[in-house]
């Protein structure tokens, strides 16, 4: 696996994708947002979701109706009207970070859009460093799908630097039982694609399900780290002790993740 040269340029375009659901894509997006905001940089976040999930889009993020986009892709004019805000964020902004957060399982639509728009070329032309973060857990199907997504990204968006995100939600990636489906998927599918990536990001497990009550309450990572415990307890409905314990778990997780992000995206 190669290491991508770091850059102090604050103009980053970040595509975040997982081929399926419950892989950790949203947590990855929140971690990148927290990293940027801790440095005083406010990212522009576009979130692809179905109409049914529109209400889950956090305040301040731009909702893009993926249902309408599927229907519009065959018509260049229709697709442009839906996706134009993303292009404007790239062409009109200075010193910004633009995050594209795809809903899980949108591989075909994502690939079609990159092919039709050649958006990675626009990103490069406007002086942005382009990234594609592909998220996987250590389950066999997830690793196989992530490997395919990395391969597809290399074909449809060649100018984006690929990052493999290893989410340890169900365990690590270093001790699979010999002969297991996971061992085969890791060795035969994921490792060859990982070797072609610019970098890797590892998300350890957040102990004691510490993130779940905060996520359900709509809190950001920086909210959890910076708000008084009493306020966290009031917002989430947790007891003071449980709120403090959950925050400790999130803080320990962030202490491992944030240095990785700073090496990868040195925005401070």
Annotated model-derived regions:
Residues 96-114:
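Switch II (G3) loop of P-loop NTPases
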Residues 108-205, 211:
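Conserved catalytic-core segment of NTP-binding enzymes
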Residues 9-79:
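Walker A/P-loop NTP-binding active-site region of P-loop NTPases
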Residues 1-7:
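Pre-Walker A adenine-sensing motif
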Residues 15-17, 43, 96-100, 130, ...:
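Generic beta-sheet signal
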Residues 12, 19, 163-168, 179-268:
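P-loop NTP-binding site
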Residues 68-78, 171-173, 205-213:
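A short acidic, often aromatic-flanked loop/helix-cap motif at beta-alpha or helix-coil junctions
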Residues 58-63, 86-101:
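Switch I (G2) and immediately adjacent beta-strands of P-loop GTPase domains
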